[in-house]
Amino acid sequence: CDNLSIDLIYGLPDMDAAEWEAQLAEVAAYRPSHLSAYALTVEPGSLLARQVAARQWRMPGQDVLAAQYGILTDWCDRQGYEGYEVSNFALPGRRARHNSRYWDIRTPYLGLGPGAHSFYRLPTVKKTADAAEAAGTENPDDGAVALRRANLPDIRAYVSAPHGDSRYEQERLTETDLYHEYVMTALRTADGLDKGRIAALPPDLRTACLQNLQPLLTNGLLYETETAYRTTVAARYRADGLALAFF
């Protein structure tokens, strides 16, 4: 297969560096065009959470997670994979279009099935009662410019719903919401914050963004190119924390 993608999880209970390196060696045998790697998250209320609380499993600390991530990125460099997002790596020209669509925060997408998410921009229309109804709100002046819908995760409820009446949760997003989401995703990518998109922001958001960038540039966490502000490789693992500077 010339278009294989593999998902990996590190930070498993009691996983040491040797075991993680052995898993990466096994991946190398398949030579996938793309791979994603995520640190294991203990979700509250899950079986794993109960087992960890009962000390049946011992979860690694942040220092171990950082070390395992370092092993991963070093391995990817040796194997010729581009780390184009904190958790995603690809051979040249093989970035995941599926993942990239989510991170763009502009492109609409449709989610089908239990737990699936959809996103689309609201049409720019005259703010009337009819427009409010079309946008799914009684208040056309709430500032929302986009909708995100999440189908409920209950499989039985989803399949038993009448046709066209699937149950979902809905989030209305303002320009500020979309700006914050863009910052959070862009700082995680190799492409960084696009200068053209910053220039197109509403004036208040553009001014705030440029002001918030400066300390990160001064401290060497971001660097500037002709077209973007990008997270340094060393700081990209901390991208979620860096995004807090923009809130």
Language model features by range: what are they?
Residues 8, 187, 213, 221-222:
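Generic leucine side-chain signal with a strong bias for well-ordered alpha-helical environments
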Residues 70, 181, 207, 237-240:
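Generic detection of well-ordered alpha-helical segments
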Residues 228-232:
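Minor-groove-contacting beta-hairpin "wing" of winged helix-turn-helix DNA-binding domains
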